């Protein structure tokens, strides 16, 4: 086993493991989570409720009905499966799992990052409701590019911090 591990570069090992984790996530989602629907439903409904609370706190009059959030007097926004952040949560977790590091710290990065992404999705849902009330003609632009504003900075920052943290741990362990 040591000879095999030493003959594969760390990058190749990471890419192989990331591919296996991603394929496993896709199979789990397609064969178990999607048909069951409970996790998607939870993320959609709770995201709408959190967004409603946030907007109410900010002074907006909102109404929710299941997966739909509406700024009163305007069209609502429905949060469907596939738009509730679950796919991105899986990708984020896959990277953290695939990149080497101690499991205790990995668990902290996973938990913290997943919670932050979940909350960012609630903010994103609130943004959709306000944007749809204010600029409905540009809805598709906001929807298509919102991940670049709400999710990717968080994911890339946590991924970066995870790699930097592990490089420092390796330097400390080697000295």
Model segments located where?
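Hydrophobic N-terminal alpha-helices or hydrophobic patches in metabolic proteins across all domains
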Residues: 1-175
């Amino acid at each position: 086993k040591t000879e095999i591990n030493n003959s594969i570069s760390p990058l190749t090992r990471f890419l192989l493991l990331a591919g296996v984790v991603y394929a496993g996530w896709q199979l789990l989602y397609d064969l178990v989570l999607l048909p069951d629907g409970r996790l998607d439903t939870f993320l959609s409904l709770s995201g709408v409720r959190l967004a409603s609370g946030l907007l109410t706190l900010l002074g907006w009059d909102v109404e929710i009905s299941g997966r739909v959030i509406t700024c009163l007097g305007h069209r609502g926004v429905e949060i469907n499966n596939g738009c509730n952040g679950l796919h991105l949560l899986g990708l984020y977790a896959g990277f953290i799992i695939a990149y080497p590091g101690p499991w205790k710290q990995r668990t902290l990065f996973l938990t913290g990052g997943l919670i932050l992404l979940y909350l960012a999705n609630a903010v994103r849902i609130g943004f959709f409701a306000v944007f749809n009330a204010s600029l409905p003609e540009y809805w598709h632009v906001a929807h298509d590019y919102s991940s670049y504003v709400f999710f990717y900075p968080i994911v890339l920052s946590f991924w970066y911090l995870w790699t930097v943290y592990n490089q420092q741990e390796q330097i400390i362990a080697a000295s």
